[in-house]
Amino acid sequence: MLKQRTIKSLVKTVGIGLHSGRKVTLTLRPAPAGTGIVFTRVDLPEAVEIPVAASAIGDTRLASVLQKDGARVSTVEHLMSACAGLGIDNLYVDVDAEEIPIMDGSAASFVFLLQSAGIEEQNAPKTFIRVKKPVEVREGDKLARLEPFFGFKLSFTIDFRHPAVDKTGQTFSIDFADTSYVREIARARTFGFAHEVEALREMGLARGGSLDNAIVLDEHRMLNNEELRYGDEFVRHKILDAIGDLYVVGHPLIGAYVANKSGHGLNNQLLRALLADQEAYELVTFDRVEEAPAAFLPQAQPAFA
């Protein structure tokens, strides 16, 4: 059978919160089969556990924020994206602040952390959510859709009218049956515009943002000294975000995701719309590994890629 996965040993790192600018200690621990991914605010007088779920996402203006009983864990999408890319089903995530550290603005640091801990299979079948019919949400000219597809592929179109973005490509599609998440998506960094960063700082946000953890653009060009990691890094990062946003549903999706100018909020609305229609999806497991979609086979999601 295609089995669930967790990590082999505890691992921790320290980083900076993107919005608070404060030091954050992140600890990842193995979790038993069937646990799912559970975030815990260990800095509160009484620790609050927040299991990932589409319904647990509250604020989505600047990031995906898990909320429960007044406790928040912000900016979970890059870590969730890494977990999806490596096929991690069960994990305890302990954090001593209200946001996950931004690291270098991509998912690469989290991939490294998870791989350093070691990834092991558990004696329980991996459960998938298989999309059975199209589900779509719109907001003005923004769109996010899930369609039936025996695998996992994504297509994303952005529309940032900026010289640096225009020349890199505004649309990107990827099918994980024949493409490595670690190589092709994980290293794509978040990006923002200098005038937006200043506005956020005036609101007491983005205090941890810098050229070390984001691609920053002025009106004409990229301010970072280094080159882009991918020719089309901007749209690839939107795919990275979408993978993380979708993974908060609690299981890997078997289906195709199509988006135009979508963001954290619309991605979460899409999950809620899917779950609200019981005829739109089903839970499936695979007793025989070879019957599973190629995107989820061990060779497509190796513990070390």
UniProtKB/Swiss-Prot annotation:
Necessary cofactors: Zn(2+)
Coiled coil: none
InterPro entries to which the protein is assigned, alphabetical: Ribosomal_Su5_D2-typ_SF, UDP-acyl_GlcNac_deAcase, UDP-acyl_GlcNac_deAcase_C, UDP-acyl_N-AcGlcN_deAcase_N
Amino acids binding Zn(2+): H78, H237, D241
An example Gene Ontology molecular-function term: metal ion binding
Cellular component terms per the entry's GO annotation: membrane
Protein's GO biological process: lipid A biosynthetic process
Involved pathway(s): Glycolipid biosynthesis; lipid IV(A) biosynthesis; lipid IV(A) from (3R)-3-hydroxytetradecanoyl-[acyl-carrier-protein] and UDP-N-acetyl-alpha-D-glucosamine: step 2/6
Gene3D superfamilies, per database record: lpxc deacetylase, domain 1, lpxc deacetylase, domain 2
Catalytic machinery residues: H264
Origin superkingdom: Bacteria
Pfam families: LpxC
Keyword field contains Ligase: no
Reactions accelerated catalytically: a UDP-3-O-[(3R)-3-hydroxyacyl]-N-acetyl-alpha-D-glucosamine + H2O = a UDP-3-O-[(3R)-3-hydroxyacyl]-alpha-D-glucosamine + acetate
E.C. no: 3.5.1.108
Keyword tags: Hydrolase, Lipid A biosynthesis, Lipid biosynthesis, Lipid metabolism, Metal-binding, Zinc
Family: Belongs to the LpxC family.
HAMAP family: LpxC
Job of this protein: Catalyzes the hydrolysis of UDP-3-O-myristoyl-N-acetylglucosamine to form UDP-3-O-myristoylglucosamine and acetate, the committed step in lipid A biosynthesis.
The name this protein goes by in its record: UDP-3-O-acyl-N-acetylglucosamine deacetylase
Species, as recorded: Cupriavidus taiwanensis (strain DSM 17343 / BCRC 17206 / CCUG 44338 / CIP 107171 / LMG 19424 / R1)
UniProt gene name: lpxC
